[in-house]
């Protein structure tokens, strides 16, 4: 198979939530495949170290401040990205947040903060970018979901609702924008260590418990998602849209051990 199907040379990708964690995993993978980037965060100065890293790979990275809870901030980001490169080919819709609490302790403000960021923000970022993609007749939108897009976990009620919503939103936008040459898919990671959950990974007993539940017997590593995000961004996925692609080591199978541990 030709490497051209996975080559992103000459492509421009926006990666939201790129100051840490998954956003940097995705941005790094796209840059290594040849893409130039627009990287965003609510705090502009938090992007500068990652900008330098991408430039050391020989690619360009334009940092832009973005608050996905603000319509004005979203439109400004999309306009700046368009101005910087003259086009937008790829969007990795990654910005998100979480609050871990028992469902009975979730407040109105907790719910709104998570849904406004993860679901409403993702929609309006996609909308602003899609307008520019549609004008050119080409685009790849990759919404970032989670294993919680298909499974429920105690202590994550609003987060799970937001990620389930991302899955449904992806299908709707794919149906809406496919005729314009824009594909919309959802990449759903399983358990990967990030800033949001690093405290949990410091508990060795919990990591052992988690690993035992994953068919591949370990949590995800950063480069486990590299080929997937590049695939969804590249020509290789040109006839795939509206799909959820889980990268989770199999934990979403929900398997219960029916045999004794060996």
Regions found by a protein language model. Give the residues of each.
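Active-site helix of classical SDR
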Residues: 126, 162
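Short C-terminal tail/terminal secondary-structure segment
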Residues: 2-5, 151, 230, 241-262
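Substrate-binding pocket helix/loop in short-chain dehydrogenase/reductase
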Residues: 102-103, 110-115, 206, 210
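Alpha-helical segment proximal to the catalytic Tyr-Lys
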Residues: 131, 175-179, 238
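Residue(s) in the substrate-gating loop at a strand-loop-helix junction
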Residues: 146
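Conserved glycine-rich cofactor-binding loop
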Residues: 12, 19-21
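Active-site loop immediately N-terminal to the catalytic Tyr-X3-Lys motif
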Residues: 104, 151-157, 179-180, 217, ...
